[in-house]
UniProtKB/Swiss-Prot annotation:
Keyword Transmembrane helix listed: yes
EC number(s) recorded for this UniProt protein: 7.1.1.2
Protein name stated in the entry: NADH-ubiquinone oxidoreductase chain 3
Catalytic reaction(s) noted: a ubiquinone + NADH + 5 H(+)(in) = a ubiquinol + NAD(+) + 4 H(+)(out)
Coiled-coil region(s): none
Gene3D superfamilies from the UniProt entry: NADH:ubiquinone/plastoquinone oxidoreductase, chain 3
Molecular functions per Gene Ontology: NADH dehydrogenase (ubiquinone) activity
EC category: translocase
Organism of origin: Tetraselmis subcordiformis (Marine green alga)
Transmembrane segments: 8-28, 61-81, 86-106
InterPro entries from the UniProt entry: NAD(P)H_OxRDtase_bac/plastid (IPR023043), NADH_UbQ/plastoQ_OxRdtase_su3 (IPR000440), NDAH_ubi_oxred_su3_sf (IPR038430)
Known function: Core subunit of the mitochondrial membrane respiratory chain NADH dehydrogenase (Complex I) that is believed to belong to the minimal assembly required for catalysis. Complex I functions in the transfer of electrons from NADH to the respiratory chain. The immediate electron acceptor for the enzyme is believed to be ubiquinone.
Membrane-topology annotation of the record: Multi-pass membrane protein
Length: 117
């Protein structure tokens, strides 16, 4: 337990500092909303429509796929660096992970989740 004391202190200090910064920003920041400040900003143009419009579900699917494959890359880099030390067990564990991701990708492809009709 004592070996995690530094991590606990760091976590508590970070939490206290973040809370202090947020609290001070509410105290010292001017709170004067006007129509220009609370309106949606669209690259200098007047807003064409409500900023909270509906999105097509395919955008969310693409975002989720991006997150999944981005996480795959974050797992692959440390695995590639330590491949010599982790041996066959680490190799086959990552191969199983990649096979599961590939099966999921093929399933989504066959279901038409990547089609933009």
């Amino acid at each position: 337990m004592i070996e995690y004391l530094a991590v606990l202190i760091y976590f508590l200090f970070s939490l206290a500092l973040a809370s202090l910064i947020i609290f001070l920003s509410f105290i010292f920041a001017p709170q004067k909303p006007d129509p220009e400040k609370i309106s949606a900003y669209e690259c200098g143009f007047d807003p064409f429509d409500d900023a909270r419009g509906k999105f097509d579900i395919r955008f969310y699917l693409v975002a989720i796929l991006f997150i999944i494959f981005d996480l795959e890359v974050t797992f692959l880099f440390p695995w590639a660096v330590t491949l010599g030390k982790i041996g066959f067990f680490g190799f086959w564990t990552m191969m199983a992970f990649l096979i599961i991701l590939t099966i999921g990708f093929i399933y989504e492809w066959k279901k038409g989740a990547l089609e933009w009709e």
